[in-house]
Amino acid sequence: IVSPPVCGNYFVEVGEECDCGLPRNCQNQCCNATTCKLIPGAQCEDGECCERCQFKGAGNVCRPRRSKCDIAESCTGQSPDCPTDRFRRNGVSCLNN
């Protein structure tokens, strides 16, 4: 059984851009809780690369390097999400010799 999307259930479903719950409970300034759409001018409502309803600029570090083989990830300026965690390619030494 497939049910239609329900605005106000905290799940972003087909046709929704955001879902912060019922209007009386919504604490998200970027989301219109009545329509489950972003407010005018907003690019995003949540994510490591979303700040005050806008994408953070390209180059903002969203996941710092955690080891010598890890590579720091930065926002792209085009998405609210931090890119996939990346590491140095196989065969490259990560040790200080």
Swiss-Prot record:
It comes from the Eukaryota. Transmembrane segments: none annotated. It is found in: Secreted. InterPro entries: Disintegrin_CS, Disintegrin_dom, Disintegrin_dom_sf. It holds the Pfam family Disintegrin. GO terms for biological process: proteolysis. The keyword Hydrolase applies. Disulfide bonds join C7-C36, C18-C31, C20-C26, C30-C53, C44-C50, C49-C75, C62-C82. Its main location: secreted. Residues 4-90 form the Disintegrin domain. Its EC number is 3.4.24.-. Gene3D superfamilies: Disintegrin domain. SMART domains: DISIN (SM00050). Glycans are attached at N32. A motif (D/ECD-tripeptide) lies at residues 68-70. It is an enzyme of class 3 (hydrolase). Its cofactor is Zn(2+). Keywords: Calcium, Cell adhesion impairing toxin, Disulfide bond, Glycoprotein, Hemostasis impairing toxin, Hydrolase, Metal-binding, Metalloprotease, Platelet aggregation inhibiting toxin, Protease, Secreted, Toxin, Zinc, Zymogen. SUPFAM superfamilies: Blood coagulation inhibitor (disintegrin). Monomer. This is Zinc metalloproteinase-disintegrin-like bothrojarin-4.
